[in-house]
């Protein structure tokens, strides 16, 4: 029997490239042993060995791979781009650090506020992004970029419709695809968009980077408008800034409570970190959990917490972005209602506690449960969905009620308030989610089949199938509304 063919990349010299990258990281790790290199997150001393270990796992998995199902934009292309970028960024770090055995050279890199220190901090952030990206697309070394589930449903549909199973695209191609849905003027604005999206600074956009971007600048219908107001025009936005640098920058405003700046979190990619001066002059940093930044800033302004962006008097008005989204509807068939009734239950009842109604939706898998059960589940250090074991990347407060039938033209008018690209995307199903463990708790979902015809599919949810014990006759469906509603969400203080 002939031996199984190795992946194409493995045959083209990929093993040597991976080995060379690991050796480079090991050399950099030796240069970072100076005690003065101990900094807040992200720390090169921590990132370099972790990245080297993950690359070793990738090499092992690639060596043992029996087939190579990925085409253009798959594992081969991603690794070629990743390793080339790693070599470039690694050399830049090596030039900034003192050579081995010459500790008296390049001393400016250890001086707080120096240009060399700032360059090193930015490179540490890039290495942090690269490690997070590799971990997301190659968990435990095994490629799963073609199965990657974006957190926001509309973003997932956009990527899979336009990019298929590819996990990485050249910037020029991605730019044209995005602009077809969200137009952007060429020139400085387009360049600013590239610098925000391209977290690893390699001239490409991966599905992971797009996921982070869409989580930061949600909701989808006004994605780039949100980005322009928050990242381009807002004086409080800081790109590529670390926890320590935020503390340093706000020192100048300790006598001006209400001063604040915000940045993408480097420890929780896809979420925001806000640094601000409290009423007693303390400098605090917090990460709002699963809530759009513009809502957090507006509430902070109302409460007198976020008043002076980067110490400036003018606080931009973000109210134009806080519009109520149209209701998101899901459909429950009559047979499903009968099934719930047979179990002495209802659709809206949380299937974990069986006491409270569902009021929160887990992202990206879309499962519904009550916020109390979700909080208790996460307090037990469980960061995966209790139904499908998909990673919990976000959550959305919802309100469930049985809807009254509306005339078709009225329903269409409400739905039409979303942009065309969003409307088209909403008519497609989400891609598959591969759970890491079997479900342990009851599951909810609606059956797929011929009876689905005519159902509204705005913002469809990827939920597990609920199978009835006996076949039931097809009956008319009943419309339910799952309504996103604003509610206060807890905030977590960033401790690292």
Curated annotation (Swiss-Prot):
Q: Where is this region: 4H?
A: 7-144
Q: What class of enzyme is it?
A: transferase
Residues that the record marks as modified (Phosphotyrosine) are 340
One annotated Gene Ontology cellular component of this protein:
ubiquitin ligase complex
Record-listed 4-O-phospho-L-tyrosine binding positions: 263
Tissue specificity field: Widely expressed in tissues, where the expression is restricted to epithelial cells (at protein level).
Q: Which CDD domains match?
A: RING-HC_Cbl-c, SH2_Cbl-b_TKB
Activity regulation (UniProt): Phosphorylation at Tyr-340 is necessary and sufficient for the activation of E3 activity.
Q: Which domain of life is it from?
A: Eukaryota
Outline the segment boundaries, as ranges, of region: Interaction with RET.
350-494
Q: How is it modified after translation?
A: Phosphorylated on tyrosines by EGFR. Phosphorylated on multiple tyrosine residues by SRC. Isoform 1, but not isoform 2, is phosphorylated on tyrosines by EGFR.
Please tell me where Ca(2+) binds in this chain: 198, 200, 202, 209
Q: Name one GO molecular function term.
A: calcium ion binding
* Ranges for region Disordered: 432-453
Q: Where is region (EF-hand-like) located?
A: 145-217
Question: Per its UniProt record, what Gene3D superfamilies does this chain match?
Answer: Adaptor protein Cbl, N-terminal domain, EF-hand, SH2 domain, Zinc/RING finger domain, C3HC4 (zinc finger)
Q: Which GO terms describe its biological process?
A: cell surface receptor signaling pathway; negative regulation of epidermal growth factor receptor signaling pathway; negative regulation of MAPK cascade; negative regulation of neuron apoptotic process; protein catabolic process; protein stabilization; protein ubiquitination; response to glial cell derived neurotrophic factor
Q: Catalytic activity, per the record?
A: S-ubiquitinyl-[E2 ubiquitin-conjugating enzyme]-L-cysteine + [acceptor protein]-L-lysine = [E2 ubiquitin-conjugating enzyme]-L-cysteine + N(6)-ubiquitinyl-[acceptor protein]-L-lysine
Q: Where is this region: Linker?
A: 321-349
Q: Which residues form the Cbl-PTB domain?
A: 7-320
Question: What's the entry's take on its domains?
Answer: EF-hand-like and Sh2-like domains are required for N-terminal inhibition of E3 activity. The N-terminus is composed of the phosphotyrosine binding (PTB) domain, a short linker region and the RING-type zinc finger. The PTB domain, which is also called TKB (tyrosine kinase binding) domain, is composed of three different subdomains: a four-helix bundle (4H), a calcium-binding EF hand and a divergent SH2 domain.
Q: Please, what other remarks does the record include?
A: This protein has one functional calcium-binding site.
- Its name, as the record gives it, is E3 ubiquitin-protein ligase CBL-C
Q: Source species, please?
A: Mus musculus
| Gene designation per UniProt | Cblc
């Amino acid at each position: 029997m002939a031996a199984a063919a190795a992946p194409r990349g493995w045959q083209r010299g990929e093993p040597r490239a991976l080995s060379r990258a690991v050796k480079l990281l090991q050399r950099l790790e030796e240069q970072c042993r100076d005690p003065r290199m101990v900094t807040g997150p992200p720390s090169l001393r921590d990132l370099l060995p972790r990245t080297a270990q993950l690359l070793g796992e990738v090499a092992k998995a690639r060596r043992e791979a029996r087939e190579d199902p990925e085409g253009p934009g798959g594992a081969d292309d991603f690794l070629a781009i990743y390793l080339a970028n790693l070599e470039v960024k690694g050399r830049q770090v090596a030039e900034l650090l003192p050579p081995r055995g010459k500790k008296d050279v390049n001393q400016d890199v250890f001086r707080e506020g120096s240009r060399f220190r700032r360059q090193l901090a930015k490179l540490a952030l890039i290495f942090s992004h690269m490690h997070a990206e590799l971990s997301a697309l190659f968990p435990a070394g095994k490629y799963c970029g073609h199965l990657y589930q974006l957190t926001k449903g509309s973003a997932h549909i956009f990527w899979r419709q336009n990019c298929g199973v590819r996990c990485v695209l050249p910037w020029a191609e991605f730019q044209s695809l995005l602009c077809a849905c969200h137009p952007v003027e060429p020139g400085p604005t387009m360049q600013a968009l590239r610098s925000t999206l391209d977290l690893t600074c390699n001239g490409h956009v991966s599905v992971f980077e797009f996921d982070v971007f869409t989580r930061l600048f949600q909701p989808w219908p006004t994605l780039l408008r949100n980005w322009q107001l928050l990242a381009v025009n807002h004086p409080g936005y800081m790109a590529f800034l670390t926890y320590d640098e935020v503390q340093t920058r706000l020192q100048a405003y300790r006598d001006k409570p209400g001063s604040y700046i915000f940045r993408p979190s480097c420890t929780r990619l896809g979420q925001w970190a806000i640094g601000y001066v409290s009423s007693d002059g303390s400098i605090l940093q917090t990460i709002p959990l699963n809530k759009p930044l513009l809502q957090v800033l507006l509430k902070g302004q109302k409460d007198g917490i976020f008043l002076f962006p980067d110490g400036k008097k003018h606080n931009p008005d973000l109210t134009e972005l806080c519009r109520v989204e149209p209701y998101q509807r899901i459909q429950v068939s009559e047979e499903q209602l009968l099934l719930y009734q047979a179990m002495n239950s209802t659709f809206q009842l949380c299937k974990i506690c069986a006491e409270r109604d569902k009021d929160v939706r887990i992202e990206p898998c879309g499962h519904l449960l009550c916020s109390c059960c979700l909080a208790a589940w996460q307090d037990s250090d469980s960061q995966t969905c209790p139904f499908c074991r998909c990673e919990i990347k976000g959550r959305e407060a919802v309100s469930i009620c049985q809807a009254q039938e509306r005339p078709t033209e009225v329903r269409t008018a409400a739905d039409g308030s979303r942009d065309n690209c969003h409307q088209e995307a909403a008519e497609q199903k989400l891609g598959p989610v591969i759970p890491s463990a079997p479900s342990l708790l009851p599951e909810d979902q609606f059956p797929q089949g011929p009876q689905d015809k005519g159902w509204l599919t705005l913002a469809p949810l990827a939920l597990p199938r609920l199978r009835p014990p006996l076949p039931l006759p097809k009956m008319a469906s009943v419309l339910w509304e799952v309504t996103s509603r604003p509610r206060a969400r807890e905030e977590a203080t960033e401790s690292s």
